[in-house]
Amino acid sequence: MTAQVISGTELSKTIKSQVAQKIETYTQQGKRSPGLAVILVGADPASQVYVGSKRKSCAEIGIQSKSYDLPETTQESELLALIDELNADTTVDGILVQLPLPKHIDSTKVIERITPEKDVDGFHPYNVGRLCQRIPTLRACTPYGVMKLLETTGIDLHGKHAVIVGASNIVGRPMALELLLAGCTVTVTHRFTKDLAHHVRQADILVVAVGKPKFIPGDWIKAGAIVIDVGINRQEGKLVGDVEYDVALEKAGYITPVPGGVGPMTVAMLMFNTLSAYEMKIAS
């Protein structure tokens, strides 16, 4: 059995097109366009690529992107002052600070400084807390994108055993909350987990986000499982995921490719969240 490949590239185009249509409707009514402030501190090459794709998407769909490229030497106090300014700016609906930040800046303090209504990354404790209490507003982009990918399979998630490999604040933890909200029985594994293979083999839905190339052997995959590979790693000049794709492809029921799986969805959901933040503001 060869798995059906879930294309994030295709779904992300659909979502971005829907967002663009809504923005066009608002601007035709004489309303302003949504505004997204994107802050990059330093010159990390991967971060520059991610920020570039986010700004490009904004331009494509009609979101006004405001760019703040700050030097590596920027002080925490300067970054916090910029966030205060953007919080107060009525033309800015979303504020995104590209992570990771330089070592001398406390990312928790920075995330918490963004007003929750403009936290389009969905990382603020207030927004994570709302998801935890089953009343989500702005949801973390990658896990939210994964839920949209799972929807395309048409499979009822209620009662399915979902196993998450990796417990980061950005993917693993909010992913667990999303899957719980969808009615799954959720297991979260991490670096202290004993017998990882045992857990992975039981997964009806497997989400892997550890950032290690081919970390999960393909023969661990349960026959017919849905495999969501969040990892993007460079190996021998190629982009590969956290799952041994070729072997997993023969065992899974559905699988996301790398590249072209989860990556494009993260950006699409950022656009979706920016529109949501804008709509909440114009409604109030």
Swiss-Prot record:
Gene3D superfamilies: Leucine Dehydrogenase, chain A, domain 1, NAD(P)-binding Rossmann-like Domain
Keywords for this protein: Amino-acid biosynthesis, Histidine biosynthesis, Hydrolase, Methionine biosynthesis, Multifunctional enzyme, NADP, One-carbon metabolism, Oxidoreductase, Purine biosynthesis
BP GO annotations: L-histidine biosynthetic process; methionine biosynthetic process; purine nucleotide biosynthetic process; tetrahydrofolate interconversion
CDD domains named among the record's database cross-references: NAD_bind_m-THF_DH_Cyclohyd
SUPFAM superfamilies, sorted: Aminoacid dehydrogenase-like, N-terminal domain, NAD(P)-binding Rossmann-fold domains
Record field: catalytic activity: (6R)-5,10-methylene-5,6,7,8-tetrahydrofolate + NADP(+) = (6R)-5,10-methenyltetrahydrofolate + NADPH; (6R)-5,10-methenyltetrahydrofolate + H2O = (6R)-10-formyltetrahydrofolate + H(+)
E.C. no: 1.5.1.5, 3.5.4.9
Keyword Aminoacyl-tRNA synthetase: no
Pfam families for the chain: THF_DHG_CYH (PF00763), THF_DHG_CYH_C (PF02882)
Pathway assigned to this chain's UniProt record: One-carbon metabolism; tetrahydrofolate interconversion
One GO term describing the cellular component: cytosol
UniProt-listed PROSITE patterns: THF_DHG_CYH_1, THF_DHG_CYH_2
Disulphide bridges: none
Subunit organization: Homodimer.
Primary role: Catalyzes the oxidation of 5,10-methylenetetrahydrofolate to 5,10-methenyltetrahydrofolate and then the hydrolysis of 5,10-methenyltetrahydrofolate to 10-formyltetrahydrofolate.
Full protein name: Bifunctional protein FolD
Originating gene: folD
